[in-house]
UniProtKB/Swiss-Prot annotation:
Cofactor(s) needed by this chain: heme b; Ca(2+)
Modified residues (Pyrrolidone carboxylic acid): Q31
Site positions (Transition state stabilizer): R68
Organism: Zinnia elegans
Signal peptide boundaries: 1-30
Residues given in the record as heme b binding sites: H195
Protein name from the UniProt record: Basic peroxidase
InterPro entries for this protein: Haem_peroxidase (IPR002016), Haem_peroxidase_sf (IPR010255), Peroxidase_pln (IPR000823), Peroxidases_AS (IPR019794), Peroxidases_heam-ligand_BS (IPR019793), Secretory_peroxidase (IPR033905)
Phylogenetic classification of the source organism: Eukaryota, Viridiplantae, Streptophyta, Embryophyta, Tracheophyta
PTM comment: N-glycosylated.
Amino acid sequence: MSYHKSSGTILMVPLFMLLISVNYFMSCNAQLSTTFYDTTCPTALSTIRTSIRSSVSSNRRNAALVIRLLFHDCFVQGCDASLLLSGAGSERASPANDGVLGYEVIDAAKAAVERVCPGVVSCADILAVAARDASVAVGGPSWTVRLGRRDSTTSNAAQAATDLPRGNMVLSQLISNFANKGLNTREMVALSGSHTLGQARCIRFRGRIYNSTLRIEPNFNRSLSQACPPTGNDATLRPLDLVTPNSFDNNYYRNLVTSRGLLISDQVLFNADSTDSIVTEYVNNPATFAADFAAAMVKMSEIGVVTGTSGIVRTLCGNPS
């Protein structure tokens, strides 16, 4: 068999494959709709909203947990609820997802929906809607969620290890990591603003204290050092936003400007580099941050969706059936 081809033909192969990939992505997203459950489960959205409001009301930290669940799901294998699957070899069991919590919040929302519309609404859609409702519940922005995602039947722990961003990444690594998912630098900075909510463990921010040349405010450094020594206390929690950790606002960015970002991947966003201007804009214009965050969440929540006759609608989000 001969493999001699003209240079023009060789160039056409990757272009052809790129067009196929783009068309497939557009086709999948085209099957999403805001009216997807209007006839099959008209109370789906209100049922999810009530469940999430109740969960966040009982513990405001749940808002951060739910938003993080969506992020970790979408970055590995797409927004297909693969993260929610339990068992050996699953994304959920990956060390990269160690410390990810809140699965019971989605399970409760799923159970509530199953009571009114059994076997209709996917876990992937419930997670996407729940993240939006969690944001609203703590004073954050709302956004339109297009529906019609299906649930995957597989989950990949190894892919979680390679695809998820890490708390010790430098700026160039973060930009590349998000670009791999079709998200630009501004969207990366906006989505990082979800760290206005939630907490991180000592094992995740220890490098910020002892192994980083990034600027760190002295009193903040002293406080972190006391809570998180060079060894031990791995599970000690500290808020990602030390000012208003349970409310959605722009204080996360204000903290970065004063060198009080908890993770290395936080502080690199404001470190005399290309993203400083975006951080400054979000400090000065909280409405711009809220709008950009909402738009980025919409885009992220449609990464790699499973639609149509592909995938399934799980009865229990943790089981592949």
